[in-house]
């Protein structure tokens, strides 16, 4: 095995989950060069990863604003050049590790002259949007979807797996100076989520900060434009920070002792950084059994169709239960 190509062109958290498989592939075939085809956003999860030889940037045909050059002609040319470049590398194995079928990734893979191409089919995929899959197919962690395609690795559970990200040393130093350093544990509140059903109301975050703020440093992370207004912070002691890039986000998170987040990328980034996680999930087996943080101490809370039904007291108790294991 000389060269392996993985294609993962979806979300940041999904790419973080793929780092377990990448690491296992490198251990199985230590002399193989592992390449990854990623998109602009999720590629940051692979920066400085010693298991990865090179990351290639996917070129979109329709969502061209996501490309380095967004014009139609430029995008077509850049995609053609990308295909030709990858073909010249003569890969031995191609893997699309998604549990569901990613049509863009599969279409791209079909253009590659690679002798061994593996991805999930309509018969083997798991798409949590399809009721028949949830009702009739085994629910396993998304990480294992990739391992199912590579039985040579002999991995069938997440018990001995972990995720990997590598924060920039310079950015770690920057955030060490920026964040509170008073001997208390740093707890990250990740208050943003694009999905309505995974948004915990600000009033709950406020109440949680009120309960924990005397004993811990509360660091609030939010998406651009979603930082709480100063009036909303009256009565609580917190530090709101701006992480404008994914590398900044990873580096800032590396200074935390605990992550509190709904089901999204911070759950997996926390796990990759070996930081305990309190995860807030919808009460759907196909969510919390597929996307829990692996390789790290964690507490999962799930209730109702929307996480706003998870109580503040339950989250506080989960935080307290994990803190003694990380910070005494």
Region spans (language model):
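Catalytic machinery of carbohydrate-active enzymes
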Residues: 1-328
